[in-house]
A protein has these predicted regions:
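N-terminal nucleophile
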Residues: 1-190
Length: 190
């Protein structure tokens, strides 16, 4: 995640399930450059030389998801509301944690968030994360992940809260004391 708080931009990149495996010996560029370019106002090229990804870009009130599957770049502008994305498509029911938790996040958002204090908004969403962690970090429905059981050396490392307006980004993060294991977060300004 990269934040440009002065320009109201935020970008998050997620690894995407590879639909086309690159040829052996192919040298791929880092996906990290894409988030840096995004917060500077640059678009993803039509044929990135990276592994597959989903890039979430926030610029003021506009939110876009750009996906690269190794064959084509797709861009979707999000409608207002609650959405989830992981290693497949936006709001994709193929992802167990999206099927399980998207309705609960949406339910927690039914009260007009603008009428809630910042701490109340945070508590609702952190509560959903905590409930998901009760399943265990290797469970397909869990949001806080330890994917080593599935053959991937990836673990959840932190929890972030971001609020974006037309002119600024407010960002807080909390590192998980033990990667892949939930604990009550203590947030610090980013």
């Amino acid at each position: 995640m990269v934040v440009a708080s002065d320009s109201g931009r935020l970008a998050v990149i997620l690894n995407r399930a590879e639909e086309i495996v690159p040829d052996p010996g192919t040298i791929l560029e880092t996906r990290g450059d894409l988030v840096l370019a995004s917060v500077s106002g640059h678009s993803v090229p039509d044929h990135p030389r990276t592994a597959a990804f989903n890039l979430v870009e926030v610029a003021g009130s506009r939110v876009t998801v750009t996906s690269w599957d190794g064959m084509a770049v797709r861009r979707i502008e999000l409608s207002p509301g609650v959405h989830m994305i992981a290693h497949h498509d936006l709001d994709d029911p193929r992802t167990a944690r999206i099927s399980r938790w998207l309705p609960e996040f949406a339910e927690q958002s039914r009260t007009e968030l603008g009428s809630l204090s910042q701490s109340a908004w945070h508590e609702r969403w952190i509560g959903v994360l905590a409930r998901s962690a009760e399943l265990g970090p290797a469970d397909d429905e869990s949001i806080i992940r330890d994917n080593r059981a599935h053959g991937y050396p990836t673990l959840s490392l932190l929890t972030c809260l971001a609020e974006v307006s037309a002119d600024a980004v407010s960002f807080e993060s909390a590192a998980l004391p033990t990667p892949g294991a939930w604990s009550d977060p203590t947030f610090s300004p980013g």
